[in-house]
Amino acid sequence: MSIQLGIIGGGVMAEAILARLIAEKTYAPEEIIVGEPHGARRDYLQKTYQVRVSPDNQEAANVSEVLLLAVKPQVLDRVLASLAGGANRPLVISILAGVSLQRIQKGFPDHAIIRAMPNTPATVGAGMTAIAANKMVEPDQLAKAKAIFSAVGNVVEVPENLMDAVTGVSGSGPAYVALMIEALADGGVLAGLPRAIAQKLALQTVLGTAELIKETEEHPAQIKDKVTSPGGTTIAGVAVLEKMGFRSAIIEAVRAAYRRSQELGKK
């Protein structure tokens, strides 16, 4: 069976994508090769997932139809140098945060390239990935990229100039939500609940509310209004959140992350 997917880098996000692709049968293990410099990590990936591994990035690039770049941005130039001069022209997909299509294009002239931004829930198959393609990408290649990231959650296609905004919402968003869950649980502890119960209540409340909004397709404000009865407990809590600037704090957090992403992209 021919190699369909090459992954450069065998870190946490790369492994998460690899595991889900195999579990979802998007690719068979024998269709995947991973280029990874560390011997212990190569051994682990080979034994755990039965994929082909190699210390040579060029080997992975030369035999793959799709090449997924999953290295740290600070080693990108070195990795691109190791891939230079290959005869093969795979579809290149980059998941490097803050790295533009133009920068990837310098290492892969005349290649179809897709920039992707998955978030950390992808590690459990509940991710949100935004993708942006250059002009060389054909419809069938775009479909392949969407299939890869559909294995780890949901996918949306956006123009590249919106990727910094994506970073502010879904890229950084898991931290905001985690902070809110922690604060909600802390409030429960303050009110007398045992920590374990408070955390379980907070977690399931966030999960359940997100699922409710997703399934009903109602605006979040409609869900809020249904819970807030006149003179009741919920509206009392909502009033405090509004007074303390909860809504504007979230908006400003997104804007700050967006601006920081823009700054990092210029370096």
From Swiss-Prot:
InterPro entries: 6-PGluconate_DH-like_C_sf, NAD(P)-bd_dom_sf, P5C_Rdtase_cat_N, P5CR-like_CS, P5CR_dimer, Pyrroline-COOH_reductase
Keywords attached to this entry: Amino-acid biosynthesis, Cytoplasm, NADP, Oxidoreductase, Proline biosynthesis
Entry keyword Amino-acid biosynthesis: yes
Catalytic activity reported: L-proline + NADP(+) = (S)-1-pyrroline-5-carboxylate + NADPH + 2 H(+); L-proline + NAD(+) = (S)-1-pyrroline-5-carboxylate + NADH + 2 H(+)
One GO term (biological process): L-proline biosynthetic process
GO MF term (any one): pyrroline-5-carboxylate reductase activity
Pathway named in the protein's UniProt entry: Amino-acid biosynthesis; L-proline biosynthesis; L-proline from L-glutamate 5-semialdehyde: step 1/1
Localization, UniProt: Cytoplasm
A GO CC annotation given for this chain: cytoplasm
Main location: cytoplasm
Pfam families the record matches: F420_oxidored, P5CR_dimer
Keyword Cytoplasm attributed: yes
Top-level class of the enzyme under EC nomenclature: oxidoreductase
Catalytic activity, EC: 1.5.1.2
Alphabetized Gene3D superfamilies for the sequence: NAD(P)-binding Rossmann-like Domain, ProC C-terminal domain-like
Purpose of the protein: Catalyzes the reduction of 1-pyrroline-5-carboxylate (PCA) to L-proline.
PANTHER family (alphabetical): PYRROLINE-5-CARBOXYLATE REDUCTASE, PYRROLINE-5-CARBOXYLATE REDUCTASE 3
Similarity comment: Belongs to the pyrroline-5-carboxylate reductase family.
NCBIfam families according to UniProt: proC
Name used for this protein in its record: Pyrroline-5-carboxylate reductase
Species: Synechocystis sp. (strain ATCC 27184 / PCC 6803 / Kazusa)
